[in-house]
Amino acid sequence: PIAGSMVLAAILLKLGGYGIIRMMQILPTTKTDMFLPFIVLALWGAILANLTCLQQTDLKSLIAYSSVSHMGLVAAAIIIQTPWGLSGAMALMIAHGFTSSALFCLANTTYERTHTRILILTRGFHNILPMTSTWWLLANLMNIATPPSLNFTSELLIMSTLFNWCPTTIILLGLSMLITASYSLHMFLSTQMGSTLLNSQTEPMHSREHLLMTLHLIPLMMISMKPELVI
């Protein structure tokens, strides 16, 4: 069910990050060099999840693996235990909570009209539902972390934290962000561009679906304009 996917991606997955923050507070303060294996593992996990996204043909699976890859960055930032790292992790959890939930919602609107989640079979939506394409574009831009979104601010904080801790991590981070941009653009082009396989009887987007997307993306845009609310 789509409601379960949205709650799982937006809230339950982020509770794991919150749990890591709480656990780090009660652990004895040690040098972050002790946590090197865990940080490398988190970044490597993020890259592997991103690479898995590139192989996906199922729309919901792609969005789910995308959530996993972002949580790898969150875990790495939390483990370093610096104010910037914690701020970036908190901001990314909030920003990606909105973004991934919006993407799952859009995937469901696509599924209700095509009755398939295969990317190649859902193409051509911009011809018949242009407003849906606009929502897809905005959600994917947020997922890529384009400025001035909160996703961009949080990833910039995390990148600065990891680079100050160990400059070599910029290679893993850069690779991760490159792959994120690749699969997000692939997802958008696969679902929106090309000639449609649907007949002309496709029902239009309902007001409730527009309202759902507005309630996801407008708060995120407003927080992006005033990030000190969450950072």
UniProtKB/Swiss-Prot annotation:
Keyword NAD: yes
GO MF annotation list: NADH dehydrogenase (ubiquinone) activity; ubiquinone binding
Catalytic activities: a ubiquinone + NADH + 5 H(+)(in) = a ubiquinol + NAD(+) + 4 H(+)(out)
Gene Ontology cellular-component annotations: mitochondrial membrane
GO biological process per UniProt: ATP synthesis coupled electron transport; electron transport coupled proton transport
EC number: 7.1.1.2
Function: Core subunit of the mitochondrial membrane respiratory chain NADH dehydrogenase (Complex I) that is believed to belong to the minimal assembly required for catalysis. Complex I functions in the transfer of electrons from NADH to the respiratory chain. The immediate electron acceptor for the enzyme is believed to be ubiquinone.
Protein name (record): NADH-ubiquinone oxidoreductase chain 4
